[in-house]
Amino acid sequence: MGRLFYKPENAWVGDLIPYYENGTYYGFYLHDPRIRDKEYAEETTWHLIETKDFVNLDYKGESIARGGIHDANKNAYTGSVIKCEKDGLYHVFYTAYNEDFKLRGKTIQSVMQATGKNLENLETVKDFLFVSDGKQYEEFDWRDPFVFWNDEDQCYYMLLASRVMNRGDLRGGCIALCK
């Protein structure tokens, strides 16, 4: 049996974001180009590979571009993918990070959205920026959104890795629920 290991040319694979539909597995991953020595997770975008059998992989390229140096999504980090039955569009919610966006001396994280009719060409929704209000949860840890449909409430839920306000750097980590 052969060994399967995917590595893009001139980059590293960050987090893997899986999605499955109609017999095809979609493996979004954080494409880390490591442009500068000893600099990790800078200029990160979402790239896509597809497979039906986990032996033959089809690289599709960049699916979500990052923003510019003045945008919240200078780096596009981990998130999740859903397909909305109402509009037929794919919706991706992902962590947006720019080390230059700071509050009280700490970098903040936010959530952005990308949509598309197919998974290969997703466009960031420029006016969607979801941030913590800084009352219950800290603004610094607001990341890794996971979105799913809740049948009982008939609405989408979003889970986020977060931190309860004023618990210190080593305490207070939690999962935030947004409806």
Locations of the language-model features?
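Beta-rich carbohydrate-recognition and catalytic domains
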Residues: 1-144, 148-179
